[in-house]
Amino acid sequence: MARTEYYDDPNAPKPNNMVVAASAVVTDNQGRILLQRRRDNDLWALPGGGMDLTDSLPGTAVREVKEETGLDVEITGLVGTYTDPKHVIAYTNGEVRRQFNVCFTARIIGGHLEISDESTELRFVPPPELANLPMHHTQQLRLQHFLENRERPYLG
């Protein structure tokens, strides 16, 4: 199912659903960041997705990283909360989401890289190369906040 992301766009459709989601900035021992090229919009993104009713938010991030990349991770911190109502995601099935995302930091504790049906490519990216990848504004913001090494998480 394809999707289109909107940010501060007066032509964006109105949301008909709110989804609580979690994402994770997963780094390797060289400080590179794990990204996936999404099949549904061909943009690079952090691993992440919607919370199940039986999940905690950190558990959601751990599960989504495993499902989307094959890696087992441990949550190590919090990048921030992202609840901007100007960010809307429209799916081809008619769902238009306003997303509530909590972004964590995580370290790899096992598994091996394996592309899921949600992505076409997985890559560990050195921070200076992030700007060269096609990526939605909201993903760039999470990465920027991570790279700033903030004393406190972003709350927005």
Name these PLM-found stretches.
Residues 72-81:
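A short coil-to-beta-strand element that immediately follows conserved catalytic motifs
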Residues 28, 32-68:
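Conserved Nudix-box catalytic region and its N-terminal flanking loop in Nudix hydrolases
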Residues 84-112:
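Active-site-adjacent beta-strand/loop module that shapes the phosphate/pyrophosphate-binding cleft
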Residues 1-23:
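Acidic, metal-coordinating catalytic segment for phosphate/diphosphate chemistry
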Residues 42-43, 112-156:
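Nudix hydrolase/Nudix homology domain
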